[in-house]
Every structure is written in C-alpha cells, then in structure tokens.
From Swiss-Prot:
Family to which the UniProt record says this protein belongs: Belongs to the BI1 family.
Keyword Translocase: no
Residue ranges of the TM segments: 24-44, 45-65, 74-94, 105-125, 137-157, 158-178, 196-216
Coiled coil: none
Cellular component GO terms held in the UniProt record: plasma membrane
Keyword GTP-binding in record: no
Organism from which the protein derives: Haemophilus influenzae (strain ATCC 51907 / DSM 11121 / KW20 / Rd)
InterPro entries per the UniProt record, alphabetical: Bax_inhbtr1_CS, Bax_inhibitor_1-related
Official protein name in the record: Uncharacterized protein HI_0044
Taxonomic lineage: Bacteria, Pseudomonadati, Pseudomonadota, Gammaproteobacteria, Pasteurellales
Length: 220
C-alpha cells in the first residue's frame, strides 16, 4: 500500500513537472513571437533607444510586476508587457546594425542563440542532470559582470567590452541549463517565472553574440 502511494506521488510529480515545462515552452514561444513583432514595429518606426531611466524603470518595474503577479492570470499579461518592452528596446539596436550593413551578423547571432538554447534544453531534458551545482558559479559570475559593466561606464576599453560580452554568453548559457533543470526537478513550479527567466537569458545571449560578432568582424 505504501509503495503504491509512493508510485502515485511520483507520477503526480512527473505530470506536474511536464505541465510546467510544457506551459513554459508554450508561453516562451508566444512571448518571443510577440517580442519579435514589437521589435519589427520599433525598427519600422525608427523609434529611439530609451534613456537610462526609462530603460531601468521599464525593465525592473515590469520584471517585478511579472514576478509579483506570477501566481495569477494577470501574470501572463505582465509577461507580455515585459517581453514587449524588451522587444521595443532591441529594435533601435538592430537598426544600428542594419545601418552599418551588418544584417548577416544579426542572422548569425540569431542562429547561434537558437543553437545554444536548443542544445542546452536538449541536453538537460535528455540527461535529466541536476544543474543546481551551477548556482554558486552563476552568482560569482553575476558579481563579476556587474563590476565589469560599472567599469565600462568609466573606461572605454575594447578588450573589456569583449570580456563582458563573452561572460554574458557563458552566464546566459548557464542560466538556460539551470532554469531548465530547475523545472524538471521541481525546483520551479511557476511557468510564468520560468518563462521570463529563460527569456531574459535568450535576450542577453543574442545581444552578446551580436556584439562579439560585430567586434571580430570589424577593425575595433
């Protein structure tokens, strides 16, 4: 009787995990598509890049709102608002690369981002390896990135820019591995939070790859 209860509990846990994972990927696909549409509109209208205050308030404000409402249906709307805002911010950046004749680099960065995301997801889903051991390294890397970004405001050093972009690629890749593992092992049970976390990682990964490609393809 006890063994049957254990088996039933395991099945229920597995079904719950699969549901969170399925909902996460579904919402991620929708928000990515919405973000791409907003980015296209932003590019078409040639909208300016937001100033630092609007950027910080928009990013952290909408991120906080999404996490606050993650347990309610309104959290889905907040997630779309957040990813839509991020799509708007990426439009002016892409226009800058298009103006410099670097459309091919945008496609390469997009392809590279897709490959990294699907490879990381496939690895975790296939091996079902627990990636929680990455948390300490991710925290340390986050501190390094924070210090590096602060330093970049005062010192315009090309090598520093390369290092920050490269570390962001590593950090984003680790985050995708960690978040996917966290879902399948029951550490994350809210698909809205999981979606936003993975979205931010993909966003940073894409921009970092694009920056690296532009640096190595130019005379900087």
């Amino acid at each position: 009787m006890q063994s049957r209860l254990i088996v039933d509990a395991q099945k229920e846990s597995l079904l719950s995990t699969h549901k969170v994972l399925r909902n996460t990927y579904f919402l991620l696909g929708l928000t990515m598509a919405f973000s791409a549409v907003v980015a296209f509109i932003s590019m078409s209208l040639n909208l300016p890049y937001p100033n630092i205050i609007v950027l910080l308030v928009g990013f952290y404000g909408l991120l906080f709102l999404t996490n606050k409402l993650a347990d309610r249906p309104a959290g889905i709307l907040a997630a779309f608002a957040f990813t839509g805002f991020m799509g708007y911010t990426i439009g002016p950046i892409l226009n800058m690369y298009v103006a410099r004749g670097m459309e091919d680099l945008i496609m390469l960065a997009f392809a590279g981002t897709a490959i990294v995301f699907f490879a990381c997801s496939a690895y975790v889903l296939t091996t079902k390896k627990d990636m929680s051991f990455l948390s300490s390294a991710m925290f340390a890397l986050f501190i390094v990135l924070l210090l590096g970004m602060v330093a970049s405001f005062f010192f315009q050093i090309p090598a520093l820019s390369v290092a920050i972009s490269a570390l962001f690629v590593v950090f984003s890749t680790m985050t995708i591995l960690y978040e996917t593992s966290n879902i399948i092992h029951g550490g994350e049970t809210n698909y809205i939070r999981a979606t936003v976390n993975i979205y931010v990682s993909i966003y940073n990964l894409f921009l970092s790859l694009l920056r690296l490609l532009s640096i190595f393809s130019s005379d900087e």
